[in-house]
Amino acid sequence: MGWISGFRLRLAANALRNGRIVAYPTEAVYGLGCDPFNEDAVRKLLALKRRSQIKGLILIAADVEAVESLVDLARVPLGAEVRAGWPGPTTWLIPPRPGIPDWLRGAHDSLAVRVTAHPVAAALCRVFGGAIVSTSANLSGHRPARTPVRLWRQFPRRAIHFLPGRLGGAVRPTAIFDAMSGRRIR
């Protein structure tokens, strides 16, 4: 997956803490992320992508413990399956813990979460100190960016802090499942 310096990771984590949007490599495409608990940052990210808040957002984390601060896996019928598939390219829809902001869930009763297996994305979450928003780097309705060139064609450089790195080997975006029913959503 390539090596990334601690300095670059700290710069990106500080950008997140300061309400900026960060572009970073994920399993299949470049992602755009921000601090999920900074409402202004989330709104800025949605506006940049021209994405409706109703859709909700995915949060990624470096480990299960970070996800458990957001959702209660013990109450989920498929909790063992969820844990067994992480880290990995599967996102699960899980009822959130009390106090999780509405702007993350959109019009849904669940929160989309994943423990990423991508080394750069996971390292960014670790250095940041928790989960981050992870949405594909593209304008709504356009193809996700798989190269920095495509990223910069869609977004102004001044709007995004870029964390370089190679994409993972996945060809499609991660699968999404409902952890209560097991139903595949995407």
Swiss-Prot record:
Cysteine pairs forming cystine bridges in this chain are none
Q: Which residues form the YrdC-like domain?
A: 6-186
Q: Name one GO cellular component term.
A: cytoplasm
A Pfam family of the record is Sua5_yciO_yrdC
Localization (cell): Cytoplasm
User: Which PROSITE patterns is this protein grouped with?
Assistant: YRDC (PS51163)
Q: What task does this protein carry out? A: Required for the formation of a threonylcarbamoyl group on adenosine at position 37 (t(6)A37) in tRNAs that read codons beginning with adenine. Catalyzes the conversion of L-threonine, HCO(3)(-)/CO(2) and ATP to give threonylcarbamoyl-AMP (TC-AMP) as the acyladenylate intermediate, with the release of diphosphate.
Family note? Belongs to the SUA5 family. TsaC subfamily.
Protein name, UniProt field? Threonylcarbamoyl-AMP synthase
Q: Which organism is it from?
A: Methylococcus capsulatus (strain ATCC 33009 / NCIMB 11132 / Bath)
Taxonomy, top ranks, is: Bacteria, Pseudomonadati, Pseudomonadota, Gammaproteobacteria, Methylococcales
